[in-house]
From Swiss-Prot:
Mg(2+) binds at E257. It is found in: Cytoplasm. This is Phenylalanine--tRNA ligase alpha subunit. It is an enzyme of class 6 (ligase). It comes from Dinoroseobacter shibae (strain DSM 16493 / NCIMB 14021 / DFL 12). It catalyses: tRNA(Phe) + L-phenylalanine + ATP = L-phenylalanyl-tRNA(Phe) + AMP + diphosphate + H(+).
Length: 357
């Protein structure tokens, strides 16, 4: 046994790698190893011989296993030391630049619009995107025979058989939020209502989903003059120009009376829009004085209060300001497009510090 002990302890000490160590383990204490075979011979010995040989063989086996484990740990430590020597890292080097996300142009323009109107005392109001047809149409003085209520223009929610609740639609404009704001806060009130809206339309300048912002101001003795001033201030701030000329054209909207579409004087140079100069006119929004029936639907007495309202497409004014040619690209989720037209999340737009960077 002393010879076996010396033989294997010396071989274990000289093992150069884990493969050689495994070969020694199998040769010594494996199923057919020398020490294992010796232990099988215990059954052939007399009781007196077993009392002496048994403990000695067990002690030898334990010592060999301990030597194998210690050598394996030493080899692992040596391998780690060698790896650390060859694969060093300079911790003083700067880290890798992680690509930062950008704000979508719709989010940026929504923030710009909110900042401009907040400076004029307007709060932001929001409402549900699934609306009853009363809020979306009836409360806004849109009659039942109006083309906008047809299924070819409006997304109606499917109803289960026996469901007798009023019809619901994906809102076609953010005007229902104005009704809800009047019902909740009464008069006087100044709010803008940004958000997503839905219509059955799809081409280069129309998508089934798009974004609008509508404004509402109600007080005593409000007139079209107040509306004109608010819109001039907005256009001047949004397009970041010192001078702007607006043209009000008579129009018809069921929810305002009188109604007007608003154009801005502009020019196009190299495909870029220049506001406040040139001989062209570009329509940007609709507006007017709030119809008395709409005030009544909002719970406001039209004999005591007057107001104006306006609405514009956020996607459209984003395209005009930032030179985006196709409305459909807003919804394509193309990372290349988003990196090109996106904005830093750290640049919060304000009227005094600047809207865009």
């Amino acid at each position: 046994m002393d010879d076996l002990k010396s033989k294997y302890l010396a071989a274990i000490a000289e093992a150069a790698d884990e493969s050689a160590l495994e070969t020694l383990r199998v040769a010594a204490v494996g199923k057919k190893g020398e020490i294992s075979l010796k232990m099988r011979e215990l059954g052939k010995m007399t009781p007196e011989e077993r009392k002496t040989a048994g403990p000695a063989l067990n002690a030898l086996k334990d010592e060999i296993n301990s030597a194998l484990a210690a050598k394996k740990a030493a080899l692992a430590d040596a391998a780690l030391d060698e790896r650390l020597r060859s694969e060093w890292l300079d911790v003083t080097l700067p880290g890798r630049q992680r690509p930062a996300g950008t704000l979508h142009p719709i989010s940026q323009v929504s923030e710009e619009v909110a900042a401009i109107f907040a400076d004029m005392g307007f709060a932001v109001a929001e409402g549900p995107r699934v609306e009853s047809d009363w809020y979306n149409f009836d409360a806004l003085n849109i009659p039942g025979h109006h083309p906008a209520r047809a299924e070819m223009d409006t997304f109606y929610m499917k109803r289960a058989e026996g469901d007798d609740r009023p019809p619901h639609v994906l809102r076609t404009h953010t005007s229902p939020v104005q009704i809800r704001a009047m019902q909740e806060h009464g008069a006087p009130i100044r709010v803008i209502c940004p958000g997503g809206v839905y219509r059955c339309d799809y081409d280069q300048t129309h998508t089934p989903m798009f974004h609008q912002v509508e404004g509402l101001a109600i007080d005593r003795d409000i007139s079209m003059a107040n509306l004109k001033w608010v819109l001039e201030e907005f256009v001047r701030s949004y397009f970041e120009v010192d001078d702007v000329e607006l043209r009000f054209r008579a129009s018809h909207f069921p929810f305002t009376e009188p109604s007007a579409e608003v154009d801005i004087r502009c020019s196009w140079e190299g495909g870029q829009l220049k506001v406040g100069e040139g001989d062209d006119w570009l329509e940007i929004l609709g507006s007017g004085m709030v119809h008395p029936k709409v005030l009544e639907a909002g719970g406001i007495d039209p004999t005591q209060w007057q107001g104006f309202a306006f609405g514009m497409g956020i996607d459209r004014i984003a395209m005009l300001k930032y030179g985006i040619p196709d409305l459909r690209a807003f919804f394509d989720s193309d990372l290349r497009w988003l990196r090109n037209y996106g904005f830093s999340a750290l640049d919060v737009p304000t009227v005094h510090a600047g809207l865009s960077r």
